[in-house]
């Protein structure tokens, strides 16, 4: 009996994907360019149907036709290298699937090259981390629909399940699947930073004990803020350091990095004139955090505001922070889904925004309760430009904007940095401003650079002689 699927790349994610497939009844062939990872996986299987191969040709020949090969290798040149090695061994109609974090434009290049050879190619976004890979991730496949249909029975089996539905849906042509995963990661960056800023207010402004803050996040996770990231934040805050007994959060260095997909999201938005400001600010917050030595030195040089300490009603302010966080998250998701919509329109992808929201509900890092509402909005208004103007969200933001404004103002007056909460507020106010100050920018550009401008009272382009 031939193997039904092959997995190449047996790091943590690849191994767990292979184990996931095996647990769902697939006959899985596995291959890694180094033998040790293959041997480690075999030791874990406990009799599951994972069969190791140590020669690529043997691996390929073991697969039933049309062959389906799932790549879980490092994005970039390693993917090209593996594909180059596979192509001479494959036949027309075989399918290669890239489940790594490849840039969607690389996926489109590979798709074009392989299609010319008669080989199907799917760029598959996978979210959920190592646990999701093993127990069921959110899966975002892009490529030709007929090629997807060949792999769909396996992909839908290994995906997370929510209310009986798999968190896997055909996204669109060519690089659409990896594009959706890329922006997902940008939303994830923003979501994480917004939560960090809410935590900062509770701890530094309200001076709440860390265990009490954990309880607050637990409470929030029972309501409209219910999400994976809120849930794990409560767990993180309760964790004690085994060496010191202190809260682990207090001994973790405040310096973080990024793996590239967040940056790609911002660059793609910039290239296409899409205002993904909250997502981009969350990236810049990470860059600023990496300047640890500079920040430590600046702390002793740069003055903050002189403020009079005044008592704050904790219950009132805790609820304001909740409102601020909810509104910030809605604005961040609105930016991400607007980026989906605008890019889909530019490329003719027809991204299924309703379904994208649904498959984000399980397995993935940004799974959240309000994704149900986002899906309902796009079900009613599939061509909606921005979630902010959907009646259900607009009414909630009308109610919650006061909380966000008060939290941002209190933070600013206290010298606390709230890059994403303040940017969310600016985005909200900017988006609801029918007549902006961009007319002055146009006049300035015309003054010094002879750039033309349009008028409000007649059609055409104009230039003024300012001198």
Swiss-Prot record:
The active site is at 181 (proton acceptor), 188 (proton donor). Belongs to the 6-phosphogluconate dehydrogenase family. NCBIfam families: gnd (TIGR00873), PRK09287.1 (NF006765). This is 6-phosphogluconate dehydrogenase, decarboxylating. Keywords: Gluconate utilization, NADP, Oxidoreductase, Pentose shunt. Catalyzes the oxidative decarboxylation of 6-phosphogluconate to ribulose 5-phosphate and CO(2), with concomitant reduction of NADP to NADPH. The lineage of its organism: Bacteria, Bacillati, Bacillota, Bacilli, Bacillales. NADP(+) binds at residues 9-14, 32-34, 73-75, 101. InterPro entries: 6-PGluconate_DH-like_C_sf, 6PGD_dom2, 6PGDH_C, 6PGDH_Gnd/GntZ, 6PGDH_NADP-bd, 6PGdom_BS, NAD(P)-bd_dom_sf, Pgluconate_DH. Pathway: Carbohydrate degradation; pentose phosphate pathway; D-ribulose 5-phosphate from D-glucose 6-phosphate (oxidative stage): step 3/3. Substrate binds at residues 101, 127-129, 184-185, 189, 259, 286, 451. PROSITE patterns: 6PGD. One of its GO terms (biological process) is organic acid catabolic process. It catalyses: 6-phospho-D-gluconate + NADP(+) = D-ribulose 5-phosphate + CO2 + NADPH. Its EC number is 1.1.1.44. The gene is gntZ.
């Amino acid at each position: 009996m031939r193997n039904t699927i092959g997995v190449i790349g047996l790091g943590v994610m690849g191994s767990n994907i292979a184990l996931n497939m095996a647990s769902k009844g697939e006959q899985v062939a596995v291959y890694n360019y180094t033998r040790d990872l293959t041997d480690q996986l075999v030791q874990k299987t406990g009799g599951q149907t994972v069969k190791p191969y140590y020669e690529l040709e043997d691996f390929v020949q073991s697969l039933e036709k049309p062959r389906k090969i799932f790549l879980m290798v490092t994005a970039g040149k390693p993917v090209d290298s593996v594909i180059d090695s596979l192509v001479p061994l494959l036949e027309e109609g075989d399918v290669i699937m890239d489940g790594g974090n490849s840039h969607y434009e690389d996926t489109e290049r590979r798709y074009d090259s392989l299609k010319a050879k008669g080989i199907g190619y799917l760029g598959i976004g996978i979210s959920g981390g190592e646990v999701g890979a093993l127990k069921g991730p959110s899966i975002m496949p892009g490529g030709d629909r007929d090629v997807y249909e060949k792999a769909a029975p396996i992909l839908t089996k290994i995906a997370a399940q929510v209310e009986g539905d798999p968190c896997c849906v055909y996204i669109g042509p060519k690089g659409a699947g990896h594009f959706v995963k890329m922006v997902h990661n940008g939303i994830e960056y923003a979501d994480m930073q917004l939560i960090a800023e809410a935590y900062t207010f509770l701890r530094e402004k309200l001076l709440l004990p860390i265990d009490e803050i954990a309880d607050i996040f637990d409470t929030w996770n029972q309501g409209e803020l219910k999400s994976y990231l809120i849930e794990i934040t409560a767990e993180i805050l309760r964790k004690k350091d085994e060496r010191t007994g202190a809260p682990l959060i207090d001994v973790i260095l405040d310096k973080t990095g990024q793996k590239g997909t967040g940056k790609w999201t911002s660059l793609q938005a910039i290239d296409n004139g899409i205002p993904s400001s909250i997502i981009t600010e969350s990236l810049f917050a990470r860059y600023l955090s990496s300047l640890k030595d500079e920040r430590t030195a600046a702390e002793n040089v740069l003055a903050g505001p002189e403020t009079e300490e005044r008592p704050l009603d904790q219950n009132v302010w805790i609820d304001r922070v909740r409102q601020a966080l909810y509104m910030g998250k809605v604005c961040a998701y609105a930016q991400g889904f607007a980026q989906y919509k605008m890019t889909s329109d530019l490329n003719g992808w027809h991204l299924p925004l309703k379904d994208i929201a649904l498959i984000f509900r399980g397995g993935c890092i940004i799974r959240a309760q309000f994704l149900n509402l986002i899906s309902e909005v796009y079900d009613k208004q599939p061509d909606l430009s921005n979630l902010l103007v959907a009646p259900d969200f607009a009414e909630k933001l009308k109610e919650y904007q006061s909380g966000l404004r008060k939290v941002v103002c209190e933070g600013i007056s206290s010298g606390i940095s709230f890059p994403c909460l303040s940017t969310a507020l600016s985005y909200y106010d900017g988006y609801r401003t029918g007549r902006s100050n961009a007319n002055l920018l146009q006049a300035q550009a015309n003054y010094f650079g002879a750039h033309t401008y349009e008028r409000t009272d007649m059609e055409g382009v104009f230039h003024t002689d300012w001198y």
